Amino acid sequence: PTTLVSRSIKQLLQFRDEQGGEVIVKPLDGAGGDGVFHVTKGDRNARAILETGTAHGTRLLMAQQYVPEVRDGDKRILLIGGEPKGALLRIPAEHETRANLHVGGRAALAELTAREREICARLGPVLREKGILLAGIDVLGDYLTEINITSPTGFREIEQLGGGALERDLLDVVEASGS
């Protein structure tokens, strides 16, 4: 989705207005949905959320166009050695914007769409070139919303839902890389 990374509250509010009055904001170094907010034009807390998220203009914050398909869930796709090996559909709880499982989202095994395969095919070589053997990417509708290399969760859920144990794939890639 259309994205802005800024520490300027004025820029972030202007970006929100340009995106139809609603955006998702999140810290660049966050994990598990911490610090993720749906900020709307009529929200009386919008400025306070942005002040907190930017530490009063000293820390970068990412703002993304709000994608309504989030209500249907986003996909966490695990790429091992640059190849997609498993995918989860993460569906947010009824009164929640975040689909993260530990905040009440629920998981289901998912197949990749043609667009998701295209995203993986374009991203895989870049990850391999940079020596990134494991990444979790989040896809919402047709949009890549996140590339997570610090906490790419989903292994346990994929296995519990019958999608196989991906740990062996990861170990094979690590051994083959000589890392």
Predicted feature locations:
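ATP-dependent carboxylate activation and anion-phosphoryl transfer catalytic cores
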Residues: 111-179
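Phosphate-binding site of ATP-dependent enzymes
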Residues: 9-10, 17-24, 28-119, 123
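Short, structured secondary-structure boundary patches
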Residues: 1, 22-25, 155-160
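Glycine-rich, flexible loop/turn motifs
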Residues: 2, 35, 97-99, 145, ...
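Anion-binding alpha/beta catalytic cores of soluble intermediary-metabolism enzymes, centered on
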Residues: 1-5, 11-14
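Active-site-proximal flexible loops/turns
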Residues: 15, 33, 72, 145, ...
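Well-ordered beta-strand positions
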Residues: 4, 78-79, 138
